[in-house]
Amino acid sequence: VMDVVIAGAAETDEIGVLPGHSTMRLHVEGARNAVADAGLRMTDIDGIASVSAPGPIQVADALGVRPRWIDGTGVGGTSFLLHVRHAVEAIRAGHAATVLVTHGESGKSRVGAARGAFPASSPNAQFEVPYGVTGPPSMFTIPLLRYMKEFGLTAEQLASVAVAQRKWAARNPRARYRDPITVEDVLASRMISYPLHLLECCLVTDGGGALVITSAERARDLPRPPVHILGTGETFESPLISQMADFTTSAAFRRSSAEAFAEAGITHGDVDHLMIYDAFAHVPIYGLEDLGFLPRGEAGAFIAEGHTEPGGRLPMNTNGGGLSYTHTGMYGMFLIQESVRQLRGQAAAQVPGAEISVVQGNGGMFMAAGTLVLSNRRA
């Protein structure tokens, strides 16, 4: 099987609040940075993957690329993990040689941003919004409350997720928030949607990034150390929160991660570094359990005991995560960027000797899941 790698990776020059940057400008800036990082030119790109709006064709046109393969898969924040998976398949099939995956989002400033509300004709708008499920915070609290009741997760354990990730952010000069926080600080912050406090909810920022994906053979001539894509997974559940099979676990997380681990041929003990989407503080708890790192009901205590923070035995969300680093609305691109930095040995808060990193994303609440197993060595 052809070895496919990430040969270039970069974010926009700035992330945070960028009122002078449109969504398209963020796409273009991240794309140019990633192509330069790979030591390539735009003329070397023959595949584009991007979430609309603006979409892959519009992004390609803005970059002066005439692709022979595109992917516009849009399933929320995990879309970029699926783009990587699809790019691997396209390169192996000969549909493209070098694929550029782009992201740009004016999540805070809303410059050129698409409307984010549920369309009136959608099942969500018809069957859930009338009962108070009006957006991500109120959607996510439904499974969280059930999990807390069933497994005894405490408010303090939930708050410890934000505390752990702020410790990583304190080591990252690009992180939006770096000041230390305590469990008490989290619980004293404003209630957003019970039981989630402000500091347990993701940031709302502007920014973007891009990835260059190609064969390992081609990457031999490029300047950056390649990051090998050992395994990928994707799967889906209902977009309706009410239709989850079990509020205390994500079936999509379980299936996508099992597929990626099997393809990569790794065990949980092989994993040195972990990035789990954290739009809200409980998602990494679900991730640790649904990916099989811990038995159900134990992840809250595991995080509260410090095992995922600097110096812990399972470093997780080492850029500070969506809770402290950045979160433009669709955060998955930034998960991958941090894994690439770790595997290149270039991270602000570097995990010593990291060789295998697992990236887990979700989209549309727990509707969609994508998993990547990445490494700085071949399988």
Where are these regions (language model features)?
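Active-site-proximal alpha-helical scaffold in enzymes
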Residues: 75-105, 137-171, 211-217, 326-347
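Condensing-enzyme catalytic core mediating Claisen C-C bond formation in acyl metabolism
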Residues: 1-24, 160, 191-255, 305-319, ...
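Conserved catalytic cysteine-centered active-site region
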Residues: 49-102, 106-139, 177-203, 234-239, ...
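Extended C-terminal subregions enriched in glycine
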Residues: 250-254, 258-281, 290-293, 323-328
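Short glycine/threonine-rich loop-to-helix capping motif typified by GTGT followed
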Residues: 55-63, 241-246, 278-301, 312, ...
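Beta-strand segments within the central parallel beta-sheet cores of soluble alpha/beta enzyme folds
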Residues: 42-51, 70-71, 99-104, 156-164, ...
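Conserved active-site "lid/cap" helical segment
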Residues: 1-78, 86, 147-154, 176-182, ...
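Short acidic, glycine/serine/threonine-rich loops at helix termini
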Residues: 18-19, 110-116, 170-174, 240-242, ...
